[in-house]
Every structure is written in structure tokens, then in C-alpha cells.
Swiss-Prot record:
Main localization (coarse): virion
Family statement drawn from the similarity comment of this UniProt entry: Belongs to the icosahedral plant coat protein family.
GO cellular component assignments: T=3 icosahedral viral capsid
InterPro entries xref list: Capsid_prot_S-dom_vir, Viral_coat
S domain, virion shell: region residues: 52-217
Role description: Capsid protein self-assembles to form an icosahedral capsid with a T=3 symmetry, about 28-34 nm in diameter, and consisting of 180 capsid proteins.
Region: Disordered, residue numbers: 1-46
UniProt keyword annotations, A-Z: Capsid protein, RNA-binding, T=3 icosahedral capsid protein, Virion
Protein's recorded name: Capsid protein
Region ranges (R domain, interaction with RNA): 1-51
Region (P domain, projecting) residue spans: 218-236
UniProt xrefs under Pfam families: Viral_coat
């Protein structure tokens, strides 16, 4: 009987303890801690990968050193001063819709048009510092690190831009060409490809350069409203 009585009292005490805890929880419910990562909205942006024909290459009667800046608006017509060249139309069009860009990876590849008997070599290199001057000779381009020298008659390997996770501002070709200082250019570009084309006995198409890239955009650009005519134009 004594053991039964102690067991009954124990059950009653445990029941009172559980009930007291339940009342305390109801009176002071736990407050969930805020999770800043969970509540933060996802960044507005997108990542794109694409390959485009960047440049058709013709050999002339003089050596050529071409400069291809890696920027959001690669769309430089031949003859742009300074000697920027190359057009990635899709990249340039997409970049108009965003404020900033990250070049996750960029490479250029040589694709030949010439016959197996064609002699000569094309050299491609990458310069990441706009303070560095452009080489003036075909052989000088081949000494840059990283660089690649390929026989004109071969479908050659690629030259890859060193990894750079810097966030750059988006800019179009004409605006980039108008920048004066190296520091200004470095705000919009991780560097430039340099392509050296040897001279030939006559002008001839020798190949093309393909660009392959993966880029990430952030911050949708604010589109400018249509021009509102002034008082002098409203009735015309």
C-alpha cells in the first residue's frame, strides 16, 4: 500500500510540473529569431553564356596589331580610334539593360579560312592592365603572358582571360572609346585581347576569331523616357 501511495503521489507531482510548464509557455510563447538571410530578397540579376563571331581577320601588306577591349559593349567597328575592334552583338545588346557586369569567363578562339599551304602565324594575348603599352611588333605579342601563337592555316587553341570576379559598370562601345585615362578604362573592363596578324603579299581573308563568355548582370538599368518635345516642337 505504501509503495502504491508513493507511486500515485509521484504521478500527481509530474502532472503538476508538466501543467505548470504548459501554462508558462502559453503565457510567454517563444519568439522566433529573425533570419536575415532568409528574409533578404534575392538580388535582381541574371547569368548568361554565349559564343559569337567577334572578328573577321584579313591579312594586308603590313603587320597589324589589333586591340579588343573586354567590356559590356563590345561592338567596335573597324577604324574606331583608338584601334579598338571586335563586335559581340548579343553581349552589347543585353548589357544595355543592366547596370553592372561580372565577366565569369572569357576566351577567344582562332578559326582559319586559309589553305594548308598558307604560311605565317597569328599571335593572341591578354593584357589586364591598361597602363601597359600595346606591343608594336608581331613577335612582341607572342612574348606576353598569357599568349598563344597559332599557324594561320590551323584551327587553333583558345586564349583565356585570367579569372577576374570584379564588378564592372556596363558601358557601350562609343562611350568606352571616348574614355581618356587608363584608370577610367579599368572601371569598365578587366583588360583587352591583343591580336597580331602578320603581313601578306596581298590583302586576303585568313580567318575569324570567336569569343565565348559567361557573364553575370546585376541591377536593371533605368530606361530613359522618350524625348518630350519642347514648346517649339509641340505643334510640328
Amino acid at each position: 500500500m505504501a509503495a502504491s501511495s508513493r507511486s500515485t503521489r509521484g504521478r500527481k507531482q509530474r502532472g503538476r510540473s508538466v501543467e505548470a510548464k504548459s501554462r508558462a509557455i502559453r503565457a510567454n510563447p517563444p519568439v522566433p529569431r529573425p533570419n536575415p538571410q532568409r528574409n533578404r530578397p534575392p538580388p535582381a540579376g541574371t547569368t548568361c553564356s554565349m559564343s559569337e563571331i567577334l572578328l573577321a581577320v584579313s591579312a594586308t601588306t603590313a603587320d597589324q596589331i589589333l586591340e579588343i577591349p573586354v567590356c559590356a559593349g563590345i561592338d567596335f567597328p573597324a577604324g574606331t580610334s583608338p584601334r579598338y575592334i571586335g563586335a559581340a552583338k548579343w553581349l552589347a545588346a543585353q548589357s544595355q539593360m543592366w547596370n553592372t557586369i561580372v565577366f565569369n569567363s572569357v576566351r577567344i578562339t582562332w578559326e582559319t579560312f586559309t589553305a594548308d599551304t598558307t604560311s605565317g602565324y597569328i599571335s593572341m594575348a591578354f593584357l589586364s592592365d591598361y597602363m601597359l603599352s600595346i606591343p608594336t611588333g608581331v613577335e612582341d605579342v607572342a612574348r606576353i603572358v598569357p599568349s598563344a601563337t597559332i599557324a594561320l592555316k590551323n584551327r587553333g587553341p583558345s586564349i583565356v582571360m585570367p579569372q577576374n570576379r570584379t564588378v564592372f559598370r556596363c558601358i557601350q562601345a562609343g562611350q568606352f572609346a571616348a574614355l581618356g585615362s587608363a584608370a577610367d578604362k579599368q572601371m569598365y573592363s578587366p583588360g583587352r585581347f591583343i591580336v597580331a596578324i602578320p603581313k601578306a603579299s596581298a590583302t586576303q581573308a585568313v580567318g575569324q576569331i570567336k569569343i565565348s563568355y559567361s557573364v553575370s548582370y546585376r541591377g536593371a538599368a533605368i530606361l530613359q523616357p522618350a524625348l518630350v518635345p519642347g514648346p517649339g516642337l509641340a505643334n510640328h
